[in-house]
Amino acid sequence: MSERKLFTSESVSEGHPDKIADQISDAILDAILEQDPDAHVAAETAVYTGSVHVFGEISTTAYVDINRVVRNTIAEIGYDKAEYGFSAESVGVHPSLVEQSPDIAQGVNEALEVRGSLEQDPLDLIGAGDQGLMFGFAVDETPELMPLPISLAHQLVKKLTDLRKSGELTYLRPDAKSQVTVEYDENDQPIRVDAVVISTQHDPNVTNDQLHKDVIEKVINEVIPSHYLDDQTKFFINPTGRFVIGGPQGDSGLTGRKIIVDTYGGYSRHGGGAFSGKDATKVDRSASYAARYIAKNIVAADLAKKVEVQLAYAIGVAQPVSVRVDTFGTGVIAEADLEAAVRQIFDLRPAGIINMLDLKRPIYRQTAAYGHMGRTDIDLPWERVDKVQALKDFIASK
């Protein structure tokens, strides 16, 4: 009998409290970058019933109306009614942003590699904004080269949001969560969906039967390919029986608390650093994007079926302290050769990553819900596969 292996990932909608915080932080970042592409930003947000607190450190020449950005973001998410207990019009906004520490700025603005040097490479000028380790991952389970569980989980909550915003399901409210369990065969290939959990906030007048019927027909059956579903697939729709109170009225939210949702759903390792509210000199964000870019191009080049890339940095130093490529036995060449190719083809200094992926643009708010990786609905530079030929050429030359 073949071994049955299950793997589960979850996602949350843009109306989840932690995701509200992420979107506010990234909306502030984008507003600053629109005026000052060289700004250094670390904006954190906390939300709870009736209040939003924005705090952190910035260095910028820009002036941004934080109050307006916060309220616009909340309204766009869909918290625009007093009965939700959290609305764009009535929420209290409390900003507390201060100047970036000069000790940190010293290492970011002038990397170790150029201090005291007469010959300077411009891309050596920016040092990593902190120490840390970052992971990128790709696998051939889906067209976007993502693990199937997180891909489906994102699509489910995005579909709920689309149905809410289009007016097709008027009783839906902004907060929602999904969870998908996928069964894999002995070759680690996904063969079926074993369980789906969806909890969605709703108006008090909708019946559980109606909600259950609509979620099955209009969400699950529309999102999950039919060949993954069978009569053994379990559906848990609002299993508590009621989800009227949600969003920040139900739970407080904080930037950076959904880092597994933001990446690979637990299928790959995570270095621990969050993304939202941080400009690209923070390698927590930019190097994670670079690692995904590398991993996706390796799989797209058919050099491995599954690959995880680890990068690590020291604060104030431009060059990564380590680069590691793990193909989990699926690679067609030695991992040492792949690592050599990565170092040759991808500039992994912070300034190199920023240039390579054009990260000084205000593109971040759109990443703050439904995942930073594997997106097919928006054009993100780290999702492009434009290094495939360079990788193949390098390997062929060895």
Curated annotation (Swiss-Prot):
It is found in: Cytoplasm. K(+) binds at E44. SUPFAM superfamilies: S-adenosylmethionine synthetase. Its cofactor is Mg(2+); K(+). Binds 2 divalent ions per subunit. It comes from the Bacteria. Transmembrane segments: none annotated. One of its GO terms (molecular function) is methionine adenosyltransferase activity. It catalyses: L-methionine + ATP + H2O = S-adenosyl-L-methionine + phosphate + diphosphate. GO terms for biological process: one-carbon metabolic process; S-adenosylmethionine biosynthetic process. L-methionine binds at E57, Q100, D251, K282. GO terms for cellular component: cytoplasm. Pathway: Amino-acid biosynthesis; S-adenosyl-L-methionine biosynthesis; S-adenosyl-L-methionine from L-methionine: step 1/1. ATP binds at H16, D175, A176, K177, R242, F243, D251, R257, K258, A274, K278. Mg(2+) binds at D18. Its EC number is 2.5.1.6. Belongs to the AdoMet synthase family. Catalyzes the formation of S-adenosylmethionine (AdoMet) from methionine and ATP. The overall synthetic reaction is composed of two sequential steps, AdoMet formation and the subsequent tripolyphosphate hydrolysis which occurs prior to release of AdoMet from the enzyme. HAMAP family: S_AdoMet_synth1. This is S-adenosylmethionine synthase.
